[in-house]
Structures are given as C-alpha cells and as structure tokens.
Amino acid sequence: MEETLKSLSMDYLNLLINGQAFSDVTFSVEGRLVHAHRCILAARSLFFRKFFCGAAADQAAAPPGALLLDHLSPRSPSGGASASSPRGAGGSAAAAAAATPGAVIPVSSVSYEVFLLLLQFLYSGQVSLVPQKGEPRPGCGERGCWHTHCAAAVDLALDTLAAARSFGVEELALLTQKQLAGMVEKASIEDVMKVLMASRKQDLHQLWTTCSHLVAKSGLPPEVLAKHLPIDVVAKIDELRLKSMSRRSPFLSHHHHHPHAAAAGIEASSAAELDDHHKIRRMRRALDSSDVELVKLMVMGEGLNLDDALALHYAVENCSREVVKALLELGAADVNHPAGPAGKTPLHVAAEMVCPDMVAVLLDHHADPNVRTVDGVTPLDILRTLTSDFLFKGAVPGLAHIEPNKLRLCLELVQSAAMVMSREDAQTAAVNAAPIYGESPGGGGGGGVYNASGTSSSMVNLSLDNRMVYLNLGMDAQFGKMNDGGDGDDGGSRGPSSLFSPHGFP
C-alpha cells in the first residue's frame, strides 16, 4: 500500500514537472510562468476551490490568500496587464481571470521558489524545505553550506510557513513548523529571534515556546534584546529567566518549607544579575569614551570580569584601535575568549569587519588565527570567503563599504600569523623530539651541554618577534603609519558594523 501511495504521489508530481502537459491554468510569479491543473488544486486546497468557483468575487468572502494574488488582475499569456480596475473590484477581476481560458494569473508577495514548494506539496503531499546543498543563497555567505540551519534555510522555511497559512494549506504549515523547531536548536540567536517574532505574529504557540526558551538561555542582557525585540517580548523573556532561576535556586530544593527564604534567594539572584547588567552598561560607556582607566578600576575594585562582559568583543566592534590595545595591555581579558552561541573570538569579529587595524593589534597580542567557532570556522575562513565573494560576485552583500585593499591586507596578516604559528608548532615538536643533552651547538668539543627546551623557547620567542615585525611592516606599507601610539587613528577606517552580526554573534 505504501509503495502504491508513493507511486501515485510521483505520478501527480510529474504532472507539475512536465509543465504544460494537460495544464488548464497558468500563474505568473516573479515574471516566470507556472502551469498547473485546476482539478488538483481545487481538490487539495479550499482556497483554490473557492477561487476557481468564483467565490473570490466577493472580497468579504474571499479566502485569506487572495490578497497574495496581486488582487488577481488577469493578464494575457504574453504578460501584458489588463486595464486596471478599482481596488474593490480586484476580486471580480480574479474570478474573470480564473474563468478565462488562456489568462495568466499574477501572484504577488510570494517568491517563485516558495510558490513551487506550495504546489509541490499540493500535488504530492510531500516537500523538502531544505535548499539544495552547496547552492549559493542570498542569506548565506558560506561556501559549501548544507543549508540545514543557516539564515537562508530559516528564511525559506518562514516564507513557506507564511504562504501555507495564507493559502490555507494547514498540513504544510504544520510540517514547516516542525522543521523550524528543529532548525532553531542549531541556528544563530539572530535567526531564533526572527522565528520568535514570526511565531508571535502568527500565533504559533509551540514554536513561540521553543524559541522564547532558547532566547532566555542565550544570556543576552535585556538592553541587547531590546534592540531586536519589542519591549513586551523582552519582559516575557525576563520572566522566563526568573522562573528558571527559581527552579534552580538551592533555597527551593533544600528549604522548601521556608517560602520567605526561597523568595529572598530568588530576589538576591535577581539583584546580582541586575548588578552585573549595570556594570556592563557602565563598562561600555567607559569604553565608548576611551576611559580604560575606569574599566581598570572596575576590574580591580568591583570584580568586573572582562571576558564575561565581552569587553574585548565590544571594543573591537565599537571603539578605536588605541582603546583595544589599552584593554589588552590590562592583562585581564583573554584575547581568544569565545562569545555567544557561535563561539566567536575578537579576531573573528575583526575579520568580519575587515578592519586591518583591529586584526593587527589582536595578532600583536597573540590572537590565535586558527581558533574555530562552534561551526568550525576560523578567522582565515571568514576572510577567504569574503575574498572569494569579491572575486566572483564583485561585491559582498551587506558589506558594500569594504575596500578590496583592506580585505587583501587583512587576509595577508591572518595568513602570515597562521604560517608563523604553524612553524612554531613544528619547531617545538622537532626540539621536543631531539635528545635532551648533546654537544654544544658551538662545537669545540669542550663537553658543553645545552638544554633543548631552552633552545625551543628562544626559537619561539624569535618567531614571535618576527611575527610582530611583519605585522608592523605590513601596516606601515598600507597606511604609511603604524606605531604603538597610533596617533591620529580613531578607528574610522572601519565601516559601520553591528555588534550583533548576521553570523550569530550576540
């Protein structure tokens, strides 16, 4: 029986694939013609049944998806539009288009790809919402991406969900919701918030619950969430966090018979969290005004943790090179600290910004060019992808302000640092494999003894010195100036960038 149903499904799908074979209705989507069959669409969709039967002539009785059909003004097969009718007469024009043989029905507000997915489901009862593996997508800049949970896959699923609900195809809507629920578990926090807002708009309670809990677990402070979400949604996220803290509170588990003590514990936790938010806000204001001394006092006197506060990430993206350099020289921040669900380091952020100043100062302070995000992406991978996009596409979407020379310089700096680190690792391995004692390198037969680990240390220090010399020479060649003071550099060479990039950094 199952094989018979599969065969039937494929037979109907072949009707759609074969285009004009036995077709009796034609749609125009984004300037491309889609041939279909009235009987199948009417049998599978209440919307199309009403539409083809002329019920859409009455705007009040028209199904919700009728608005997607461009008020259904009929066109000739050649694509020419008929004389425009008043807005209120759009439904009558729709009925005329549906009843006129050879008329082309224009479809608006739905992309060609989404409309085909909708028809594919109506014909066969099954559909794949994952874009083709490795296919370049507007919302995904990663080469060879499998598009299982990237921004492009999430956008396609959201568009399909909206179309399914508008056209009244509830089975497809449920299927898409399940797929989105799986996607958001691995998606970037920006995409999770995007799905959260879509589920709120369409009253999808289960998807809303999944996404709201993921956002609550992300650790993003309320002031950050407020930049992306409405205030009432931020308030609900805070409520979820308080409930989560109350469940984890030791007062509740060990002193459940003391409700006042439990309440006091929750209140203390909330107060501590609020205090941390205030510290982070003050730290950012200090960095914005280049007051690194105040940040130092907060570290020493208030116990501010620069890594937990993402101080270096914030400074790289919003402050000048001097501020980043001074912050690194405090010695209280880990230059390779991963942040956010994606696990990006400050060097990842600088690479995405294509800012040679920031890349150089981070590498000068021993940022690791080989460190990987959760998805296995290194800063070098980011720059190579951007360079490839420039070579093959001529521009990078969303980064039109980037200059090719700066991109090339960033790539050279990070490549050089990666090569130096590779040589250092090879030298260290070779020295460790050598005998611990042997003749003095100077010869002379005097029975001199040298320590291999000491030699290794000097080799590594020499390599690091060479690396810094290269970086400074590279910056001198590009900008004509680059010294420890960095006079006149206010970080203005960077293009505008958001602290919360499309790549998943919170």
From Swiss-Prot:
Q: Fetch the PROSITE patterns from UniProt.
A: ANK_REP_REGION, ANK_REPEAT, BTB, ZF_C2HC_NPR
Q: What is its main location?
A: nucleus
Question: Looking at the keywords, is Zinc present?
Answer: yes
Which amino acids does the record list as binding Zn(2+)? C140, C145, H147, C150
Q: Which UniProt keywords apply?
A: ANK repeat, Cytoplasm, Metal-binding, Nucleus, Plant defense, Repeat, Ubl conjugation pathway, Zinc, Zinc-finger
GO molecular function terms listed in the Swiss-Prot or TrEMBL record: transcription cis-regulatory region binding; zinc ion binding
Segments of this protein annotated with the region Disordered: 481-506
Q: Please provide the record's free-text comment about the domains of this protein.
A: The BTB/POZ domain mediates the interaction with some component of ubiquitin ligase complexes.
Q: What is this protein called?
A: BTB/POZ domain and ankyrin repeat-containing protein NPR5
User: Which species is this UniProt entry from?
Assistant: Oryza sativa subsp. japonica (Rice)
Task: Report the gene name.
Answer: NPR5
